[in-house]
Amino acid sequence: MPSCCCLLGLGFPSPPSALRILRRRMASRAFQLRLNPLTGDSEWLVVEEEEEEDHHPTPPPKQLLATTSYLDMLNDSARNRAYRRAIEAAVTDPSSRVLDIGAGTGLLSMMAARALAAVGGETRGGSVSACESYLPMGKLMRRVLRANGMENRVKVFHKRSDELKVGDDLDSPADILVSEILDSELLGEGLIPTLQQAYDMLLAKNPKIVPYRATTYGQLVESTFLWKLHDLHNNEANAADGVWLTPGEMERIVSVKPQQHAMQCDALEDEIRLLSEPFKVFEFDFWKRPDSHREANIKIQTTRDGYVHAIISWWVLQLDSAGSIFYSTAPRWARQSSSEGPQRDMKDWCDHWKQCVWFMQGKGIPATEDQVLSLRARHNQTSISYQLNINDEACDRSSKGDHLTLLPERIALYGDKDWRSALINTIKNALTVKSSPTCVVADDSMFLALLISSMSPTSKVIAMYPGLRDKGAAYLRSVADANNFSIDQIQVIGKRASSITADDLKHKKVNLLVGEPFYLGSEGMLPWQNLRFWSVRTLLDSMLSEDAFIMPCKGILKLCAMSLPDLWRSRSSLKDVEGFDHSVVNETLGACGYLPGDQQGPCLPYYVWQCGYTKKLSKVYSLMDFNFSEPIHSCFGKTKIEFSHDGTCHGFAVWIDWVLDERKSVVLTTGPDNRYWKQGVQLFGKPVEVNPGKSVMHVEASFDPSTGEITFSSSSTTCS
């Protein structure tokens, strides 16, 4: 985020009065970075803060907050209830000074203010201060406070907690700290440095802390699916197609990042073999200043033979000092086990806190029943890492310039035999009619650059690599010999399409324009944001030969009606949250269900297979075609859905099938049955009870080429 001094550093002295005015204006605005899905360019949005006396503030832009996890958190009743009980237990002194760091909508602050009032704090000098650095959320918090008559009982600071100062912002050090700066790994949102700074600068001696303690747990598992998510080398060896993304002696040149990866592991329960009981890893005592780094050596006795492919981890939060209020992110099988410790309340499915997966390298670590394995766990200020069998030090290329880290799903896709075969056969057919072609890889595909270069020694391959850039070039140099091509065949330009000129192509016409499509950094976006490939093709239109081969040649928007009760509940509109009205946040946070007028929540990206209980209620329908032989243009489509199963329809899943070769019907589908892709999920304004032969639904969609967005509308009818 640009700072005031950055904008003032123009080389001209500013008069003191102008400086004060600009500083005041900068203090009341923030800049939100947004990625344009069709160009890959970053765009700045300005978020203004209203003056204190403005009692009718403009809500923050919907798109800024609708894709966050705030709504899911506020629908997590177990979490809300646990925090309320713990705060009420902590606030017993009417003179308490409460500080809420990372206040969000202000829910915890309002709980503290209510608890303070209950013990007479309003007349005894008690106070509540809320710190929220993200201005769009801070604006929303002020609306929530006003809706609940709390605007004068909670003091709001749009600052990071390390910018707060006792004496300037806070009248005196706080003696109660409440916070929820936790992620699925526990530490990833900066919990430790935030608490350290608070203990050093903002808190009184011996403060009360909510939550009081957290304990992390782990469990050794065997899972073919999890193995495929990280072991590219052995999976592409099984494919045996001659293309080596990870040649011998370079097994780790493409890998997942060595970190904990958040995942809904309950969805894998039936295909996971547990190789150990749950074991305790670290205990974090928040009631005292936390350490930055620690290490633990743990002995784990295995419970059966198998290969350790991963460690699944979770945490248990103790919110009160008495040890009576807990919240757990454990998977279902561990919550049902008594070995974890005190019984935890069963809770609803939620998406904001998942379990985490730490992958073992290669084929996994072999284990026999009752074997004792040594695990070394380390944590720093923001993450926890593991090393199983301490003497088994693996080669780590991560510091080398040719090493690439990808998301687990991309690793699995690159090792998938069917996916590779579809691309190989399509490119092979294209090259039979192209002599010494000039080929442009229009995305960040390493696979296609290697494939074409190795299949066609006379080809000239121009890899755009707008995300990989120099790292992609270094990688290709490292694996060229193993794939039997000269690196001189490939030119990595590292540019977006809007910056490419005929000079970059040596004034040659492009015979092949190909993509997976895959754009580094865009993996979590909605499926149609990969239509960036269509935008690139349009920008390169004048550089294409008349008979240019384009792959994929078409995208088909598909959809399927779904029952999604767990996802619906987590995204449903809010009313009362532990006694506080949150209805003002619904539109901004993208809630669904029973909203005024025809409002509906946004279409959001999810791995549908991880969305709790799901059921398909219809067959798959085609809704819209995108023809890449033409320049990008607006599109419209509609279809009638006839239901094949009884149930409650909460919305539909939508995705794009990529047609690689229309003549040979080579299609890559990315629907819910394919677990390596996210789908878009459009939830309805109200759930609909459906019956085969009696219920139909009409769905329309339109694509706007200027924004890359697709909008949906739907209506249902019941036949007598």
Swiss-Prot record:
PROSITE patterns in UniProt: SAM_MT_PRMT
CDD domains: AdoMet_MTases
Keywords annotated in UniProt: Methyltransferase, Repeat, S-adenosyl-L-methionine, Transferase
GO function terms (MF aspect): histone methyltransferase activity; protein-arginine N-methyltransferase activity
The SAM-dependent MTase PRMT-type domain, residue ranges: 54-385, 387-720
GO aspect biological process, one term: methylation
InterPro entries assigned to the protein according to its UniProt record, in alphabetical order: Arg_MeTrfase (IPR025799), MeTrfase_PRMT7 (IPR014644), PRMT_dom (IPR055135), SAM-dependent_MTases_sf (IPR029063)
Active site residues per record: 180, 189
SUPFAM superfamilies named among the record's database cross-references: S-adenosyl-L-methionine-dependent methyltransferases
Keyword tRNA-binding set for record: no
Top-level taxonomic group: Eukaryota
Listed transmembrane segments: none
This enzyme's EC code(s): 2.1.1.-
Similarity remark: Belongs to the class I-like SAM-binding methyltransferase superfamily. Protein arginine N-methyltransferase family. PRMT7 subfamily.
PANTHER family, sorted: PROTEIN ARGININE N-METHYLTRANSFERASE, PROTEIN ARGININE N-METHYLTRANSFERASE 7
Function of the protein: Arginine methyltransferase that can both catalyze the formation of omega-N monomethylarginine (MMA) and symmetrical dimethylarginine (sDMA).
Entry protein name: Protein arginine N-methyltransferase 7
